[in-house]
Every structure is written in structure tokens, then in C-alpha cells.
Swiss-Prot record:
Recorded superkingdom: Eukaryota
Native source species: Eremothecium gossypii (strain ATCC 10895 / CBS 109.51 / FGSC 9923 / NRRL Y-1056)
Presence of keyword Metal-binding: no
Organism lineage: Eukaryota, Fungi, Dikarya, Ascomycota, Saccharomycotina
Gene: DCW1
Glycosylation sites: 84, 109, 203, 242, 267, 291
GO molecular function: mannan endo-1,6-alpha-mannosidase activity
Protein name: Mannan endo-1,6-alpha-mannosidase DCW1
Localisation per UniProt entry: Secreted, Cell wall; Cell membrane
Family: Belongs to the glycosyl hydrolase 76 family.
Length: 451
């Protein structure tokens, strides 16, 4: 685990005076471009992975490996929303370098501490790369969709029927603290990946998995309906009491994982059930807003957000933009929230000697003295999502997506060795193969990655 101390390099980056200030007009594209350029530069000040002796793709201490995956996802969004390719080469190198020996984002250097949620943040980045038509790697390199499928496959193979009648544990390996905990970010991650793969590939088996995970989360209470229109996502539950007691902390990123996952499924299926679920989670997200401006309700009020939690609004901002792209009825509300939050975030980016270091609190019309990768990432995401309705929604394999897939990715089974299956023409991701790979493993409870 990384020590929670700031490196000298990070401090010097914070103090490096450029003399530029961040001014934002949410209605002016050039203003948005200039603001996000400053913020992206500030985010990349924390990255030294391409320097001699450093690790490609990893950010400086004290930021864990998973947050690097989150940060590269923000840089990918920056490329897409702002149409700025400044960091594309670094992004490609990092996503490929950290894929690991099995090309499933379980690199040996991280596996002693890696959890299911950690793996997911890299998987989400490559899923977005496929959906956004980010330039494909050379043909002899792993491809974005195949990498995303590998993340899904390896996570699904860890589905644990031996405790609580299903669900993913937080941790992959039994020696890590939290192995006994089944939490919403890990299960929500599997749901979210299944939802996005459903839409991208058209493969109904991914939808079956999304339904399985959602139903399990609802069954144990991680997803709860506390009022008819109020859907909440609690943090987790413990297998030691058979998942009967809930940790009722609520976090923006957990809520957003489920909300956006529902939006992806609705957009693909047009099923009114998923439509209503999307809108209910959106309505319930008001718990994370004050005067239409985002805040991290689980920790910000007590001024005790840790380094990880300071990045959560970044992912929620991303999920808001995706939901708006996919569900038209959500747009009026989401655009209002994004505009107000972007203005608050811009006001917070007024600190440090450079004059545009971002803080955590977007409610005070100024800098709160906080700074870090998470704060910078969150401000970048909310401001660039001002353009969420100005850019195309995520592509699919049926409407322009070009990333090649591999439904056997991440498994020990080669696709060519599986029995022939009826795969619909046009489903380039290989609908049906996933059934043989994951369905049989699920029935056998083959938890092959859990030691």
C-alpha cells in the first residue's frame, strides 16, 4: 500500500507558478476549452510515469493504482469532449502498459493488494475507449473492447455463491483486509460493465449478468427503495453475518455506477423498468447536491474525506454526463446540476501559487485549501461534461464502434476451442461465447482467481 504522504515532486508541481487563472463562462466553448486545458495540465502534473525510473501509467504517491485508472478515464473524456489529443500517446501507452500479463488489468505488481473495484476503474477506461472510438492500438496489441471483456470475465468468474447466495467480495485475495466484505462498488462495477457490454455488443448474456447482479444487490439491501421514488445505494455488507447488516454510508460514485448502468440498459432495451430505475436514481441523487451543486455527502460535511474519497465526484460527474446522453428525460435536471457544479468547481480552482489549483468544496465560491489529484480530476470532469450533449453518445458495435472484441478475453479458455454457438451476424463481440465461458463457471462456482 502507498504511504499517504505527498512527494516533493507533487508539492513542486502545486507551487509551480504559471501566472494563469481559471475563468469559466459555462456558455462559451472557448472559455470551457481554456479552463479544461488548465485543469488537464494540472492533473498531469501528478503524473511522472514516463520519466526515467518510474512506472508507465502510475501516478505519484500517495495515489493508489486504481485512481490512476480513474485519472486516465478523465483524460480520455478530455480528448473526447474537448477534442484535444494532447495526451493521447501517454493515454494509450498507460492503458496498454498496465493491462498486465494476462491482459485483464491484474498486473503482478498490483495483485497482492488489488481489489475488484481497483480492476474495474481500468476496465471502465478501456470500455469508454471502445465506446468513444478512441484510436485503436496496432493490430498486434490488445484492443480496447477485448480488454474490457477481460475485466468483465475475470470479475464474473469470482461471483461467490458460497456466501450470501451470490455477490462479489471487495477483495480478490483472502489475505487482504476486506475479503469478508461484499460492497457496492465491486458489485456495482460488475453490473456497470455488464450493462455497457450489453449495449455495445448486443449480447443478451451480458444483460442476464446485469440483471443477476442488480437483483442480488437489491435482495441483500445494498440497493434499497426507502420511498417510492427514492432509490439508494449503501456501501456494503459483511459475509460474517450472512450479509444481513448494512453499512449505510452513501457515496456519489456508488450511486452513479448504478444510475448510469441502468441508463445504458434502458438505452439498449427501451425497457420501461430500466427507464424508471434510471430516473429514480437520478431523483435520489439530490442527496449529493446543495443548491444544484455536487458535494460528497458521506464525508465532506465533516471535513474528513480521505484521498480516495476526494476523487469520487469525478466519477459521478462522468456518470451524470453518460446518463444525460442516453436518457433524454434526464437531461434538463442533469444539465442544471452540471452547470451549477461547474461554476462552483471553477471557483474552487483558484488556489496555490499557480492560481488554478482546485479544491474539494464547490459550495463556497473559492478555494478551501485542499488540493490533490482527486480534486483536480473532479473539477476537470464536471467542467468538460458541460459538453456532454454536444458530442455523440457512446458508440456501439452496430452504429460505428470499431474496437475488436474477444469474448474469451481474460480466461484460460480459447474461444476457438469452445463448442460452436449460434452467433448473430453483426455481433462482432461474439454473442454467445460469453455464455459458455461465464455461465458454466457460474454454475460450477469456479472462483479460480480467489486463492
Amino acid at each position: 500500500m502507498l504511504a499517504v504522504t505527498f512527494t516533493a515532486a507533487a508539492v513542486l508541481s502545486l507551487l509551480a507558478a504559471s501566472g494563469r487563472t481559471l475563468n469559466l463562462d459555462v456558455d462559451d466553448l472557448q472559455s470551457i476549452r481554456e479552463a479544461t486545458s488548465l485543469l488537464a495540465t494540472g492533473l498531469m502534473d501528478y503524473y511522472h510515469g514516463h520519466d526515467y525510473g518510474e512506472t508507465v501509467g502510475k501516478f505519484s504517491d500517495p495515489y493508489y493504482w486504481w485512481e490512476a485508472g480513474g485519472a486516465w478515464g478523465s483524460i480520455l473524456d478530455y480528448w473526447y469532449y474537448m477534442e484535444n489529443s494532447t495526451y493521447n500517446d501517454l493515454l494509450t501507452d498507460s492503458l496498454l502498459h498496465q493491462a498486465g500479463e494476462d491482459l485483464s488489468y491484474t498486473p503482478w505488481n498490483e495483485t497482492t493488494t488489488e481489489g475488484n473495484d481497483d480492476q474495474f476503474f481500468w476496465g471502465m477506461a478501456v470500455m469508454a475507449a471502445a465506446e468513444r472510438n478512441f484510436p485503436n492500438p496496432p493490430a498486434d496489441q490488445p484492443q480496447w473492447l477485448a480488454l474490457a471483456q477481460a475485466v468483465f470475465n475475470t470479475m464474473a468468474l469470482r461471483w461467490d455463491m458460497e456466501t450470501c447466495n451470490g455477490g462479489l467480495r471487495w477483495q480478490i485475495f483472502r489475505w487482504n483486509d476486506g475479503y469478508h466484505y461484499k460492497n457496492s462498488v465491486s458489485n456495482g462495477a460488475l453490473f456497470h460493465m455488464a450493462a455497457r457490454l450489453t449495449r455495445y455488443t448486443g449480447n443478451a448474456t451480458y444483460l442476464e449478468w446485469a440483471e443477476r447482479v442488480y437483483d442480488w444487490m437489491y435482495g441483500v439491501g445494498l440497493i434499497s427503495i426507502v420511498q417510492p421514488n427514492w432509490h439508494v445505494v449503501y456501501d456494503g455488507t459483511d459475509i460474517n453475518d450472512n450479509c444481513t447488516n448494512l453499512n449505510k454510508l452513501q457515496w456519489t460514485y456508488n450511486h452513479g455506477l448504478i444510475m448510469a448502468g441502468c441508463a445504458f440498459i434502458y438505452n439498449h432495451t427501451q425497457d420501461e423498468l430500466w427507464h424508471q430505475r434510471t430516473l429514480r436514481f437520478l431523483d435520489s441523487a439530490r442527496i449529493f447536491l446543495s443548491n444544484d451543486t455536487l458535494y460528497e455527502a458521506g464525508c465532506q460535511g465533516g471535513d474528513n474525506c480521505n484521498i480516495d474519497q476526494r476523487s469520487f465526484k469525478a466519477y459521478f460527474s462522468r456518470f451524470l454526463g453518460l446518463t444525460a446522453q442516453l436518457v433524454p428525460e434526464s437531461r434538463e435536471t442533469i444539465v442544471r446540476w452540471i452547470r451549477a457544479s461547474a461554476q462552483g468547481a471553477a471557483a474552487s480552482c483558484s488556489g496555490g501559487r499557480d492560481g488554478h489549483t482546485c479544491g474539494l468544496n464547490w459550495l463556497i465560491n473559492g478555494w478551501d485549501g485542499k488540493w490533490g489529484l482527486g480534486e483536480q480530476m473532479a473539477a476537470l470532469e464536471i467542467i468538460q461534461n458541460l459538453r456532454c450533449l454536444e458530442r455523440p453518445a457512446p458508440y456501439t458495435a452496430m452504429n460505428g464502434g470499431t474496437s475488436p472484441g474477444d469474448p474469451a478475453a481474460g480466461t484460460k479458455t480459447k474461444a476457438e476451442n469452445l463448442p460452436p454457438l449460434d452467433i448473430k451476424a453483426g455481433d462482432r463481440a461474439g454473442a454467445g461465447i460469453i455464455t459458455a465461458l461465464i455461465g458454466s463457471s457460474f454454475l460450477a462456482c469456479t472462483l479460480w482467481l480467489i486463492i
